[in-house]
């Protein structure tokens, strides 16, 4: 078989290109360098990204994507009938090629049903036969940061190495959007703001303790005058409420009550962000917000946040990274991270000049 690098995608000839994006906020952020490489490879192409609705707002800030299509599953694209209808919609757009950043079998199946002539992605999940350009996934790539996971696939297909840096610029309407959200939730809109994302989608093994988040928040409020804003999904509302209860100072709890765009607008206003390993952590890093990320069960080598002012706190427990949803033992990876550890890192970041200040 001819090596795929010798028969890569003819990017420079493409005029209509589909990209199947990843499903989760953090993964989307980590695909941005790959999207930049695709854009650079196909300067003539109109690039459409197919994504789930809960990440769509993020692409308003991505200059490398022209159009966003929503994959509503659950919803109208659920089941075989829904996937057939989605494939029909894709067929009507006459895409010449599809790059699958998402690994699922169904991503390849839908693009095959859509009759897209060139279909490329990692040959995982039993889908190699459905792809015209399956990329072999070696073990070495799994040990590198996930930014490389996506970028190396595009490079193998013939794309350039455009670097791994990530920086999102807030939308022009973000200041007004953030002001509106903050005032709706009882804030004067005056900072400085400390953002805290105490939840984690994957499971409780990734979550630091509510009382320790609160302790750090209170001390930073006492010493730096920060006002804490809590972020998260509806599922994170209980842990956010627990943090607010534990604190001495009032907090603005936005968990479960904002759109992604509204959350991003407020995050972009934060002076400092404190988070578990989560999608919002990756967003804060991409905005260049000084950031402290608490890692326990997951591996900072592969999913650490971007950003020059991103600090990872981990104790490298002997059982970590276990990548489990719940801890089967004594949760030592998080127990060993103290409020003092996090406060010390936060105080150092808050003592540094803000970006753009002398």
Place the predicted regions along the sequence by residue:
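Catalytic machinery of carbohydrate-active enzymes
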Residues: 1-358
């Amino acid at each position: 078989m001819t090596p795929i690098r010798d028969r890569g995608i003819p990017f420079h000839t493409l005029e209509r290109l589909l990209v199947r994006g990843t499903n989760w906020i953090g993964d989307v952020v980590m695909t941005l360098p790959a999207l930049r490489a695709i854009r650079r490879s196909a300067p003539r192409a109109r690039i459409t990204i197919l994504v789930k609705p809960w990440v769509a707002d993020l692409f308003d800030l991505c200059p490398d994507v022209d159009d966003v299509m929503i994959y509503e599953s659950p919803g109208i694209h659920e089941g075989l009938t829904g996937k057939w209808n989605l494939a029909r919609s894709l067929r009507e757009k006459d895409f010449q090629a599809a790059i699958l950043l998402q690994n699922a079998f169904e991503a390849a199946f839908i693009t095959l049903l859509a009759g897209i002539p060139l279909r490329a992605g990692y040959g995982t999940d039993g889908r190699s036969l459905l792809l015209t350009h399956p990329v072999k996934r070696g073990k070495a790539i799994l040990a590198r940061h996930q930014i490389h996971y996506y970028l190396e696939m595009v490079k193998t297909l013939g794309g350039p190495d455009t670097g791994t840096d990530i920086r999102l610029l807030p939308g022009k309407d973000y200041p007004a959007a953030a002001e509106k959200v903050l005032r709706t939730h009882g804030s004067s809109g005056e900072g400085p703001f400390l953002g805290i994302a105490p939840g984690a989608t994957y499971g409780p093994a990734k979550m630091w303790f509510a009382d320790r988040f609160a302790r750090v928040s209170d001390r930073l409020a006492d010493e730096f005058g920060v006002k804490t804003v809590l972020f998260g999904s509806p599922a994170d509302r209980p842990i956010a409420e627990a943090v607010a209860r534990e604190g001495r100072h009032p907090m603005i709890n936005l968990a479960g009550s904002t759109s992604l765009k509204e959350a991003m607008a407020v995050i972009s206003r934060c002076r400092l962000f404190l988070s578990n390993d989560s999608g919002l952590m990756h967003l804060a890093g991409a905005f260049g917000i000084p950031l402290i990320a608490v890692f326990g069960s997951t591996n900072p080598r592969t999913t650490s946040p971007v950003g020059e002012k991103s600090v990872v706190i981990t104790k490298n427990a002997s059982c970590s990274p276990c990548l489990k949803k719940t801890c089967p033992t004594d949760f030592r990876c998080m127990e060993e991270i103290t409020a003092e550890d996090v406060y010390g890192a936060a105080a150092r970041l808050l003592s540094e000049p803000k970006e753009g200040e002398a």
